[in-house]
């Protein structure tokens, strides 16, 4: 499946003389991550994530763990937090918990963000500076994935297990109820063959609503898939209402 990423763009403007007016381009700089989520085992010593620079120039890689509302989380550090990664090269970053108490009976959720920072004119760390003289606009992409904190007493998620999500109708809306201590990402959901807009991540024992199209039946068949620890999709699940 397509990697699940939250992408934010930061724009960097560069002065450009008339000589290079015809060479103005927009180029994105991002890091390619080796997974769509990281499962952090709270009884472990940290987790690693592969990071690749697909560009033809070096970039800076800046990584951090965030809370809801895009606030920095001091309970986790990423090492190295900022480093140069040469063109077409890849390496690992390490996520380590240094503080914090988290529930032992269910998963918790954070966000891991990795930004690719493009070279600027005058940067001593950048090579081949001439390649960027004619460039007016560089776009720095901040790629964010789920960092799921899993207590040691919870086994690996079995995405094909039955009875994990219960469905119902409430006030004309479809209700999804998570009956497990795991976080679920629901994809390819439909009701009586009509596609449904996924309401984001469904937390442990949480309920969320799907808005149903008007004039739709209040009973029928729900189909959906969930995403596993490695980013794989489950078998198609079914629930009759």
Curated annotation (Swiss-Prot):
Keywords (A to Z) from UniProt: Chaperone, Disulfide bond, Fimbrium biogenesis, Immunoglobulin domain, Periplasm, Signal
Family (UniProt): Belongs to the periplasmic pilus chaperone family.
Entry function: This protein is essential for the biogenesis of mature CS3 pili.
Signal peptide coordinates: 1-21
Keyword Repeat belongs to the record: no
A biological-process GO annotation: chaperone-mediated protein folding
Entry GO CC: outer membrane-bounded periplasmic space
Lineage: superkingdom: Bacteria
Protein name: Chaperone protein CS3-1
Subcellular location: Periplasm
Cysteines engaged in disulfide bonds, as pairs: 113-144
């Amino acid at each position: 499946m397509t990697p699940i990423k939250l992408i934010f763009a930061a724009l960097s403007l560069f002065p450009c003389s008339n000589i290079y007016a015809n060479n103005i381009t927009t180029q994105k700089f991002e890091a390619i991550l080796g997974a769509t989520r990281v499962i952090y085992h709270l009884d472990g010593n940290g987790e690693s994530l592969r990071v690749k620079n697909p560009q033809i120039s070096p970039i800076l890689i800046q990584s951090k763990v965030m809370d809801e509302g895009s606030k920095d989380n001091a309970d986790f550090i990423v090492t190295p937090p900022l480093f140069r990664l040469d063109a077409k090269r890849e390496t690992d970053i390490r996520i380590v918990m240094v503080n914090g108490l988290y529930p032992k009976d269910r998963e918790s959720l954070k966000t891991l963000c990795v930004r690719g920072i493009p070279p600027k004119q005058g940067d001593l760390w950048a090579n081949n500076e001439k390649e960027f003289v004619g460039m007016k606009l560089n776009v720095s992409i901040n790629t964010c994935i789920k960092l799921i904190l899993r207590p040691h007493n919870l086994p690996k998620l079995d995405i094909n297990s039955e009875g994990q999500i219960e469905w119902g109708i409430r006030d004309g809306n479809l209700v999804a109820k998570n009956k497990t201590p795991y976080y679920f990402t629901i994809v390819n959901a439909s009701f009586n063959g009509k596609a449904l807009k996924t309401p984001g991540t469904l937390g442990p024992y949480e309920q969320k609503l799907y808005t149903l199209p008007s004039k739709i039946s209040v009973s029928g068949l729900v189909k959906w898939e969930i995403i596993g620890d490695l980013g794989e999709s489950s078998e198609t699940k079914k629930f009759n209402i």
